UniProtKB/Swiss-Prot annotation:
Family under the similarity heading: Belongs to the universal ribosomal protein uS12 family.
Name the record gives this protein: Small ribosomal subunit protein uS12
PANTHER family reported for this sequence: 30S RIBOSOMAL PROTEIN S12 FAMILY MEMBER (PTHR11652)
One cellular component term from this protein's GO annotations in UniProt: small ribosomal subunit
Physiological role: With S4 and S5 plays an important role in translational accuracy. Interacts with and stabilizes bases of the 16S rRNA that are involved in tRNA selection in the A site and with the mRNA backbone. Located at the interface of the 30S and 50S subunits, it traverses the body of the 30S subunit contacting proteins on the other side and probably holding the rRNA structure together. The combined cluster of proteins S8, S12 and S17 appears to hold together the shoulder and platform of the 30S subunit.
Gene Ontology biological process terms in this record: translation
Keywords: Acetylation, Methylation, Ribonucleoprotein, Ribosomal protein, RNA-binding, rRNA-binding, tRNA-binding
Xref: InterPro entries: NA-bd_OB-fold, Ribosomal_uS12, Ribosomal_uS12_bac
Taxonomic source organism: Escherichia coli O6:K15:H31 (strain 536 / UPEC)
Amino acid sequence: MATVNQLVRKPRARKVAKSNVPALEACPQKRGVCTRVYTTTPKKPNSALRKVCRVRLTNGFEVTSYIGGEGHNLQEHSVILIRGGRVRDLPGVRYHTVRGALDCSGVKDRKQARSKYGVKRPKA
């Protein structure tokens, strides 16, 4: 236990919280250009071909972003919006592509959870 005199001379150091999404720089989303669109395989118990893209952001960061939903229209030089949110079974993927924003289209024929995949309400 520090004495009062020690604390007067050198106060207690505050713990600095480290961000899980440093490339966003405290913004809710960031815009970027796809430099590579590819598939990758997940970690051990799971098996699939996950769709991801490498993105060069407007602030100069280059990050890997997951493309959620069934099917996408992204290719190299597509301009996309990314948000935070990691993919647990893909190491190094800490961002998600926002569907239905900029060049990334919404998921075709999506009926449920539409807002997460950028789909307008269907005409009844």
